């Protein structure tokens, strides 16, 4: 269906260009950056950054690793996440899957962005506030292919998603 294909493409672009950068900013500031510093140390990370050939990418990596985002950048990212969550919740109230009546790449992309949201931002995503998002996340998490992917992980990430195992 042409309309479904359009919606899939629209949601993919929305997530990649609107939500992903905002989720990423929060993720790097509060989780990834501090964990990278604790695991590898500043000296080792600086050596890796200095091997990046483009100076502007070095600046971007330092900003991410050290959480050097301004208050304005964090506020705008928070606003974007709030808008995105509202849009996802509304769209998922229309059908089982995000962009069509069938599981699609939009669902894969969305799950990879949003699976940790109930844990990292529970005030924005929980069973009371976003029942459609929670239903959708749990449905994707129960898929055999998703389970197999999680088994391949080498970190404790899978242990953080107990909330998705609830019904």
Residue ranges, per PLM feature:
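GST-like domain detector, emphasizing the conserved glutathione-binding G-site
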Residues: 1-53, 167
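Alpha-helical packing segments of well-folded alpha/beta enzyme cores
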Residues: 11, 73, 77-91, 113, ...
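GST superfamily/GST-like fold recognition
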Residues: 98-122
């Amino acid at each position: 269906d042409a309309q479904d294909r359009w919606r899939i493409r629209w949601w993919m672009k929305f997530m990649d260009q609107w939500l992903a950068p905002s989720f990423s900013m929060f993720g790097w500031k509060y989780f990834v950056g501090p964990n990278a510093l604790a695991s590898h140390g500043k000296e080792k990370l600086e050596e890796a950054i200095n091997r990046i050939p483009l100076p502007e990418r070095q600046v971007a990596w330092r900003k991410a690793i050290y959480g050097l985002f301004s208050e304005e950048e964090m506020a705008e990212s928070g606003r974007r996440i709030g808008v995105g969550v509202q849009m996802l919740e509304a769209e998922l109230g229309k059908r089982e899957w995000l962009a069509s009546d069938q599981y699609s790449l939009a669902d894969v992309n969305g799950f990879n962005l949003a699976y940790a949201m109930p844990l990292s931002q529970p005030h924005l995503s929980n069973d009371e506030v976003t029942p459609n998002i929670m239903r959708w996340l749990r449905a994707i998490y129960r898929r055999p292919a998703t389970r197999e992917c999680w088994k391949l992980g080498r970190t404790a990430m899978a242990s953080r998603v107990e909330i998705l195992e609830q019904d």
